[in-house]
Amino acid sequence: MSATRAVTVDGISWPVTGAQVAVIEGNRVLVQLRPWLPGWELPGGHCEPDEEPQLTAARETFEETGYRIRIRGLVGVYTWSGLRSAGDVLYLGTIEGGRPRRSIEAWAVRMVDLEHLPRTLFPWYHQRLRDAFASASGAAPVHRVQTVTMHHVLSFGSSWMRTPVDALRQRRRR
């Protein structure tokens, strides 16, 4: 069960139930492959009762990826318009130890270049990653409303089909 916490950006407190972390090294970011609705995303999860969001982000990152991290700062709060009413908080993090591993929540873990993100990165992460890289360069925390509707969820699945279809098209052209 998720617990609601408040995170303040520009003097306004926003309710959040989830916390994530962007671990950035140079031009690369840590992502994980979720098994259900399969897709790539940042590590993180739901806040437990009596757990601060920073601790959630660190705990979930370790459980999902095998990396122990240190929170470096706040990127922003992302509230939803559409399917969800709860918000997420995103932090910057640094790897302090551990080794990458697969888990029931992360079938694969890897560092990817910002210019070569996986095609199947969940669409709402593109803005979050732009914000995270800006934050790593000193930008102030942000609040953004992200629209996620059933259309977004259903159309996202088509990106998984494009990969094998593109491969078949390439073979036919040869």
Can you say where each PLM-predicted feature lies in the sequence?
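Structural detector for helix-capping/boundary residues
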Residues: 19, 45, 59, 72, ...
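Short helix-loop capping/hinge motifs at secondary-structure junctions, enriched
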Residues: 29, 98-101
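Conserved Nudix-box catalytic region and its N-terminal flanking loop in Nudix hydrolases
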Residues: 24-63, 76
